[in-house]
Amino acid sequence: RLFGFLPLLYSEKTARVTTIDDVLLNMGAEAARGDARHGSCGMGIDECVQRNRAGYGLSVEEVTAWSETELLERLREIRAHYTRERAAALGIDRANLYFELLGNDTVLQNYVAEVKANIGLLSLVDANRDWLSQFEHLIFESGQGLLLDEDYEAYAPHLTSSKTGLHNPALFLEKRGLTLDEAI
């Protein structure tokens, strides 16, 4: 609650979940780059994308359905089969501040407790055309800034792994036979 108001928060069931290890990998990679760092926001977005591409995805629906124990086991599995190799590829070694955190089970346990405590604030939806039709206006949360779009290479490597403009909202609507009529 904020100011006595509890907003309605919806999430597409299949939305990707960023894990604490995604965040730690991102921060560790930035630290390993030294003066050549990319200037990341530190939220692990690119690491989430990379993990999903590698076949270790995690959806909002899964996180909601699983018990704390099941989620913790899945995160441990990802750590054992993906995170260690990814950390090595990013140059995160024992001298890196984040190396130890990437092996600390308490970090995962705390993440799981926080995620499970807060995921209930979301209403999971299959945002199809019928469901969307109940709303007069849709608000799409977007990326970090137009100049950081993954396809705008003028500032490479200082980009995000996403499209930050109207591309994703327009694509989302198009898949449902809807159009983007106004953008503010």
For every predicted segment, state its role.
Residues 1-184:
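Non-transmembrane, aqueous-exposed alpha-helical and coiled segments at domain scale
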